[in-house]
Every structure is written in C-alpha cells, then in structure tokens.
Amino acid sequence: MNFETTIGLEVHIELKTHSKIFSPSPVAYGADPNANTNVIDWGYPGVLPTTNKGVVADGIIAALALHATVEQHTHFDRKNYFYPDNPKAYQITQSDKPIGHDGWVEIDVDGVKKKIGIAEMHIEEDAGKNTHERDYSYVDLNRQGTPLIEIVSKPDIASPAEAYAYLEALRQRIQFTGISDVKMEEGSMRVDVNISVRPVGQQKFGTKTELKNLNSFNYVQRGLEYEEKRQQQVLMSGGAVQQETRRFDEKTGETILMRVKAGADDYRYFPEPDLPALNISDDWIKELDAAMPEMPGKRRERYVNELGLTDYDAMVITQTKEMSDFFNATVALKADPKMAANYLQGDVNAYLNDKQVDLQATKLTPEHLAGMINLITDGTISSKMAKKVFKAITEGEDPKAFVEANGLVQLSDPAKLQPIIDDVLSANPQSIEDFNNGKKRAVGFLVGQIMKQTHGQANPQVVNKLLMAALQQ
C-alpha cells in the first residue's frame, strides 16, 4: 500500500520591537523574571491596551515578504482560555480577519522547486512562561504581551524534507526584512507541527497528530520522519490513527504520546472590545513596500549575473542577512567578489564555528576583510601570508598596518629576486640536470629553495616566471 503525507506548520515569529504589542513594557531577552512588565501585562481590571503601530507595520512587511495579500480592514479578537501564564484569561489575537492571507514561499528539495502556500498570518500577543519545580510553580510575565506573527501554512507540504526546506525559506525571508531575529534557541521562532497520512488516491485527509518539543529544524524533520512511518505502520496493520498530541524525544528519535485529543478546542473567539478596528491605507502599504530590503532571491540573482558568483556561492552567502550584508559591504570596498565569497564560506565560517559566535559578535569588519583581499590581489601579500593577516583582522587589527609592521610585504621586484634565483641554481646543479632530463619535480624543489631563502616572502608567480626563463636559457 502506498501513502501520501500531508504536513501543516504553524510558525510563531517574535517581532523585534522595543516595546510590547499592547503595553509600553520593554521587550528584552534574558531579563530578570517579571522585570519587563506593568499593569496591562498583569491583567489588572480597568486597564486598557493600546495597539503598537510598529507591530502592525511589521505585520504588513511580513505579509509583503511572503507574497501575501494584506487585509486592509482588520481587527483583533479575544481567544478565551485559562492558564497561569495568561493572567487575563484570554489572548488578544486575530481570528476571522488576519492581517495577511494567501501567500507563498518557494522551496528547493534536491533540485526540485515547489511553492508552499501560506493560508494566513495573524498578529497576536505571546503568553508568559511557567517554571515548575517540585513544591512550587513560578510565573514569569516578561514574555506576556510580546508581539508575535503566527504564520499558518496550507496543506501543501508533502514530506519531512519539504517541511525543513519550508522553515528555512520562511526564516530566511523574515530575517532579511529585519523584523525578527528568528532564533529558535532564543524562542523568537517556534514551530507547531501537524501531520497526517492517507492511502494514495483517498480524497479525505487522514487523522492528524500534533508534535511538540521540536526545538530545531533538524528535530522537526526527524520527528516528522518517525511519525510518518509510525502512522503508515498503524494503517498497514489495519489500525486507525488517533488524534493525539505527541512529544518528540531527541535521544531516541521517537514520538511519545502526551494526550489524546477528543475534539477541537473551543476558544469562543469574539472581537476585542477594547481596541478599535485597523484600517490600513494603500499609501502605507506602498510606503512599507518601497522601503523593503532586497530579498534573498533578488540578491542571489544579482550575485550571479552582476558579480559572477556561482549559483552555489550565491546560495551560501544569502543563507543569512548578516552574511549577505557583510559580503555587500566588502564588495563595495572594491574587494574581488569571488575571493570575498570564498573567504566568507571558508576561513570566516570556520572561525565562527570554532568560536561559536555570530559574525556581528566578532571584531572582523568588511573594511578589514576587503583591505586584506586587496593586498592579495595587488600582489602585496601572498595567499600563504594572508593566513597570518586573517588571524590579525579577526582580532581587530588593520591589515595594511599589520603587514608593514611584521615585514610581510611580498617580494615581487625581479631585480631583487634574480640574484637569489641565480644563487639557488648555482648551489643545485643536479636539479638543473634533472630538469633538462624532463624531471619536472626539479622545478618544485628549486622554487622551495628560493622561498626558503626569502623566508616565504617571494611572489611565487614572479619566481616561477624568472626561474623558468633561467632554466630554459
């Protein structure tokens, strides 16, 4: 029996605003418990929320970035439920009039491109955080009221690999807008997953299960792969898949039953009475659209067509906005684009991985990287010398000053190199005889001796040219 899989993803993106969505409390990751709260966050009777205009703007930007239609006449709704981290006993969100709908992102899995639809996008407030210990439970309301955008996919995702690619594409586009850090490790991107399996040809969707504890894209894919196989095995054995919530165990790679869901939750949505409706003008949408930064697809196209990068190089450089912006700034300083791309993919990435830091947390600057690359391309230093220079610029040193202070300027003057070459040839007559007998390895030996005499500072290209001329006389 053959099966087809349907996967739905609900992604919560925390917006990078200075204050919360309905209160003036600051938004800051890692603050002391309940430090960033006020009476609105606590749900005191009689206090009134005020909509943060910046959050609405970010919602419009997200909709535009994901090719969605902006809902110009929208409002907020109350989603009613009781939980300790929700002191009002309701969440302010959007139900029937989300700020964006009918969008899409394009994914690429093994060279096959596919558009994944986005059903809708809601602006809403986050809840607080509960911490449970043996004898007590604690509530931290710092996160309460933090602005979120919930992005709900259409049932277009047909495999765990496609789910991973969708999340990558979504994160990338949102990150390039600058409205969120989209860091799962800090909670600014969270994913809820639904998956169902049905026999090929069956029109009705299978019974879905919800997966929890998915703290990385890798865990999302692994959890879906296990759950896909589990549901297939249940159906092949004649059983029926139950509507359940299951937890992914990262140690075993399995999903574990948490609870059986008897039916859909009833949150009794109704329009939020304390906030006015939102009327978004055409002019505001056009203004935000005009200010949108260049998206990754456009950047890749420009890198290939205008700067001569390969498709692969362009893809790697645009994995993050931080790396792409750094590349743009480096190339703007007249650095060779291909060399800049190679350094960012190679030495820079290796350095970041070794130090376990982001690019912005280092002392490396586009000015210093471009300066080093320009010293290589103009022949001032060799690629071998550049390794020392690279280490210096990661520590914040100016490349030109470092090269001059440490005597690393490459020796390229033929008038200074020729006597050294003559001395090496005089000291190695056997190598000259070997060369004349067709042994090409002799050239490598002689070059090595010349480099040794110059302490590695001779320009290899000039050395090779002068040496070959001398040998062929």
UniProtKB/Swiss-Prot annotation:
It catalyses: L-glutamyl-tRNA(Gln) + L-glutamine + ATP + H2O = L-glutaminyl-tRNA(Gln) + L-glutamate + ADP + phosphate + H(+); L-aspartyl-tRNA(Asn) + L-glutamine + ATP + H2O = L-asparaginyl-tRNA(Asn) + L-glutamate + ADP + phosphate + 2 H(+). GO terms for biological process: glutaminyl-tRNAGln biosynthesis via transamidation; translation. Gene3D superfamilies: 1.10.10.410, GatB domain, N-terminal subdomain (1.10.150.380). It comes from the Bacteria. Keywords: ATP-binding, Ligase, Nucleotide-binding, Protein biosynthesis. Its EC number is 6.3.5.-. The keyword Lipoprotein does not apply. Heterotrimer of A, B and C subunits. Allows the formation of correctly charged Asn-tRNA(Asn) or Gln-tRNA(Gln) through the transamidation of misacylated Asp-tRNA(Asn) or Glu-tRNA(Gln) in organisms which lack either or both of asparaginyl-tRNA or glutaminyl-tRNA synthetases. The reaction takes place in the presence of glutamine and ATP through an activated phospho-Asp-tRNA(Asn) or phospho-Glu-tRNA(Gln). Belongs to the GatB/GatE family. GatB subfamily. HAMAP family: GatB. This is Aspartyl/glutamyl-tRNA(Asn/Gln) amidotransferase subunit B. It comes from Levilactobacillus brevis (strain ATCC 367 / BCRC 12310 / CIP 105137 / JCM 1170 / LMG 11437 / NCIMB 947 / NCTC 947). The lineage of its organism: Bacteria, Bacillati, Bacillota, Bacilli, Lactobacillales. The gene is gatB.
